[in-house]
Amino acid sequence: MVSVSEIRNAQRAEGPATTLAIGTANPTNCVEQSTYPDFYFKITNSEHKTELKEKFQRMCDKSMIKRRYMYLTEEILKENPSVCEIMAPSLDAWQDMVVVEVPRLGKEAAVKAIKEWGQPKSKITHLIVCTTSGVDMPGADYQLTKLLGLRPYVKRYMMYQQGCFAGGTVLRLAKDLAENNKGARVLVVCSEVTAVTFRGPSDTHLDSLVGQALFGDGAAALIVGSDPVPEIEKPIFEMVWTAQTIAPDSEGAIDGHLREAGLTFHLLKDVPGIVSKNINKALVEAFEPLGISDYNSIFWIAHPGGPAILDQVEQKLALKPEKMKATREVLSEYGNMSSACVLFILDEMRKKSAQDGLKTTGEGLEWGVLFGFGPGLTIETVVLRSVAI
């Protein structure tokens, strides 16, 4: 007679969850940040709002973003004039767009990840899909299963409207699935199309202007599994420990609400301060068991909600400027892609580490941290261990 504990032990993997492949994708429409204010105020028929345009120009100039990729083109916006108005009912128009585009962009990233992984897609046992927009039934997880031709009995998990911290959430969930289901191979897809946040400029909705200056569209996909098959699967990062916490006294710091006008965001000015004030506690909890207290000795992947957050974290922890190099590079080249950002940074870091001839996927270092920040204010923490190149 086999005991329950024996059954449980047989179900568990031996080693830690490991990233086995990464793929990314963006819409073809590339927007230069330097000229975006002119385009934005012209397409929304707001060129007469000169003071507001100057304010928006300053936001874009300070964003540290060079370019972004956006699903919304001039043609799409002209075909849907209601979405360019200030708080006009436009949710139906947005929904029709994003319920198609979120799975489509996600498929593009997933195909790249599966190709790098090099295994048949029939070996995918679990699917985690995350997006901030396009709530629908059946959801984007169902649509992706169909688009990719995955087995109909793949175990699906759909996460809607979590916001910018969710890049950490999907890794936490993938880790638990991979480590507690022997042989599991988890396809993780974060597909973010921020069109639903687009609207015309208004003096009374300055929060919305921040989003117009920062948000970009992109999708990232990972294959996660424990106990990589030697000579066949190539590990990139190990996920060693995860945590999620709500920062104290942070209610209302970042809120998002789905309205007839689309998804509206509300931000407190002190969001960078709240993040930096709580970051040390999260690091101590994560790295004290490893005997690490010098946070310049680890590699960094932080959600780039904006340059002010990165600046204050650097200042609070006395981090060397190069610690946030990969994070700032992704912010500069893609903008804030919500949950997909940290996965893009993982990809950027492993590629740059190889190009620079470093010894590990984590900039030559062994240990690292991944942070997601978002509504709540919620902080996701993932301790990563790099792999020798």
UniProtKB/Swiss-Prot annotation:
Catalytic activities: (E)-4-coumaroyl-CoA + 3 malonyl-CoA + 3 H(+) = 2',4,4',6'-tetrahydroxychalcone + 3 CO2 + 4 CoA
Superkingdom of this protein's organism: Eukaryota
Residues the record marks as active site: C164
InterPro entries registered for this protein in UniProt: Chalcone/stilbene_synt_C (IPR012328), Chalcone/stilbene_synt_N (IPR001099), Chalcone/stilbene_synthase_AS (IPR018088), Polyketide_synthase_type-III (IPR011141), Thiolase-like (IPR016039)
Pathway: Secondary metabolite biosynthesis; flavonoid biosynthesis
EC number from the UniProt entry: 2.3.1.74
Keywords, comma-separated and alphabetical: Acyltransferase, Flavonoid biosynthesis, Transferase
Biological-process GO terms, alphabetical: flavonoid biosynthetic process; polyketide biosynthetic process
Induction: By infection.
Gene3D superfamilies in the cross-refs: 3.40.47.10
Acyltransferase found in the keyword field: yes
Key word Acyltransferase present: yes
Pfam families recorded: Chal_sti_synt_C, Chal_sti_synt_N
Protein's job: The primary product of this enzyme is 4,2',4',6'-tetrahydroxychalcone (also termed naringenin-chalcone or chalcone) which can under specific conditions spontaneously isomerize into naringenin.
Family: Belongs to the thiolase-like superfamily. Chalcone/stilbene synthases family.
Protein's UniProt name: Chalcone synthase 4-2
Organism encoding this protein: Medicago sativa (Alfalfa)
Record lineage: Eukaryota, Viridiplantae, Streptophyta, Embryophyta, Tracheophyta
Recorded name of the encoding gene: CHS4-2
